[in-house]
Regions:
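N-terminal low-complexity or simple alpha-helical regulatory segments
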Residues: 1-119
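Amphipathic alpha-helix face/heptad-repeat signature
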Residues: 11, 84, 135-138, 258
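DNA-contacting interfaces and partner/effector-binding or oligomerization modules
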Residues: 107, 111-204
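Short hinge/gating elements
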Residues: 76-82, 124-128, 203, 224
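Generic solvent-exposed, charged/amphipathic alpha-helical segments
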Residues: 12, 55, 96, 139-143, ...
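Extended mid-to-C-terminal alpha-helical interaction segments
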Residues: 177-180, 184-335
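Short, well-ordered alpha-helical segments
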Residues: 89, 132-144, 211, 215, ...
Length: 335
């Protein structure tokens, strides 16, 4: 399953704000965060490979602050779906149903009992520092999401109990930061991360509820899920290379940079692509052609701007390549 690159972008932004040299690390694999395409989608395995480079040796507890850089607006149609739900119960169940549209790598579950309801987050990689860092970031970001969506919906955020699946910080100042952020009822060393509410919250109506708008965004969410579905007919390696090359605008990483990002030797990458009847050069050109056709259909984007977005230093070089691919110049194609 693929997902929006926005989650990775928010993490990188948060790490940069925390003083981590992410831009220098991204450069090692041919990436520039400022050139990332916000509409790009990325496979979870590739996202992990990139994080392994940019978040190397990062202390997991920094996730408390970094996770607060996830932005509510980045949830797109899912945000509107939740805001137009009829009740808090409906909104929570929609969040579970469409959690593939969130920025979470872990799994969300809704656990209900007679007197309380818990939004539970289960991470798969708490046994390694990078996985623990990402989990701490996502748990922190989830609380921020819950608080902000309550505010946007015109609701008061209730008192909750927070359970965290890792030990308390040994540093007293850091422990205080956790207590300040998560509240008075904070418990460590729990099996899973859980945000526990009184069950009566489920029946609370959402002031911004709108049945017509809800159906509109329900359709949009379903369409996004389809867009993120992994193409099972394609090789995982080919998909990883394509996704990596498609991350940013204006520059396409070299084969050496791609191999480093995917954590495999360049020679091995070349050989494995050859075994699958393709090459880095072929995949790169296919991607540029696809992007060129998509951009050329938008009359608001000039030919010169398209050339720049595709990494050409001069529009003449782009014109020559386009004519070689499609038998006519970009301007002729537009007519």
């Amino acid at each position: 399953m693929k997902r929006s690159i926005l989650g990775l972008m928010y993490l990188i932004h948060g790490m940069r704000q925390a003083g981590i040299p992410v831009d220098q690390r991204l450069k090692q694999i041919g990436l520039n965060a400022n050139a990332f395409d916000p509409s790009a989608v990325i496979h979870a395995d590739l996202e992990w490979d990139i994080l392994r480079t940019v978040a190397k040796d990062i202390h997991p507890e920094l996730g408390l602050d970094i996770g607060q850089h996830y932005a509510l607006a980045g949830y797109g149609p899912l945000l509107m779906l939740l805001l137009t739900s009829s009740t808090v119960e409906k909104a929570l169940k929609n969040a579970i149903q469409y959690q593939a549209l969130t920025h979470l790598s872990g799994q969300l579950l809704l656990k209900e009992s007679s007197d309380c309801v818990a939004l539970e987050y289960q991470s798969k990689q708490l046994d390694q520092p990078l996985g623990l860092f990402r989990a701490q970031s996502e748990i922190s970001g989830t609380l921020k999401f819950l608080q902000e969506i309550h505010m946007m919906a015109g609701l008061v955020f209730p008192e909750i109990r927070v359970e965290l699946p890792f030990p308390p910080p040994k540093d007293a100042d850091m422990l205080f930061k956790f207590q300040q952020y998560y509240g008075r009822e904070l418990y460590f060393d729990c099996p899973y991360a859980r945000f526990v509410f009184q069950s009566n919250i489920m029946n609370v109506g959402i002031p911004s509820s709108d049945a017509i708008t809800f159906r509109l965004y329900e359709d949009k969410c379903q369409m996004e899920i389809v867009r993120f579905q992994e193409d099972t007919l394609q090789s995982t390696l080919i998909e990883s290379v394509r996704d990596f090359l498609d991350i940013q605008r204006g520059y396409i990483p070299s084969m050496a940079e791609t191999a480093q990002a995917l954590n495999i030797p360049e020679r091995t990458l070349r050989h494995q692509l050859q075994q699958q009847k393709t090459s880095y050069k072929d995949l790169r050109e296919q991607l540029i052609r696809q992007k060129a056709l998509k951009l050329i259909d938008d009359p608001s984007v000039s030919i010169e701007r398209i050339a720049e977005m595709l990494g050409y230093s001069e529009s003449a070089a782009f014109n020559h390549a386009f004519k070689r691919w499609f038998g006519q110049s970009p301007r002729q194609y537009r007519k």
